[in-house]
Amino acid sequence: KELNEEYPNYNTVGETWVTEPAYTAWWQKDSKLSAPKNSNLKTVMDFSFFDKINTAKNEQTETWFKGLDRVYNNFVYDFLYPNPASVLAFIENHDTDRFLGEGNNLPMLKQASPLLLTTRRIPQLYYGTEVMMNGVKSKSDGYVRKDFPGGWTSDATNALTPAGRTKIQ
């Protein structure tokens, strides 16, 4: 509260690792769900979106609550948020498997990226997504936090330049 009063234009973000919108909305600043308590977090992380899109990527949208219907059903609860436009959406981060897991499914990434970037959320891109970095936590945290390829003379490849990227990247 004091931080918001002293610096009203400063944004605070909370990693609310719950996978249902009602639980996430509870933590956003001025939520009626948590009244009279107030977390004062202006931005909460949408782990529900993360969970739904990572489940949907392996499903067909054939029946209710599968595939993109699963993602859509996440957004119908936006009315629970005091400020849905100040919710942070992501498809992967440093604590999760990479969106591509251990694969390199470009069409899947091409479907998820526009949704992430155009939804009524603050999009968060984890470094390496743009060059299709993959990895799973079951191997280790370090496997999903590998160094970005490039930037140092000792790097075998340099994805910071077009010449250092593969055709698919």
Predicted feature locations:
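Surface-exposed cleft-lining segments at the edges of enzyme active sites
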Residues: 97-101
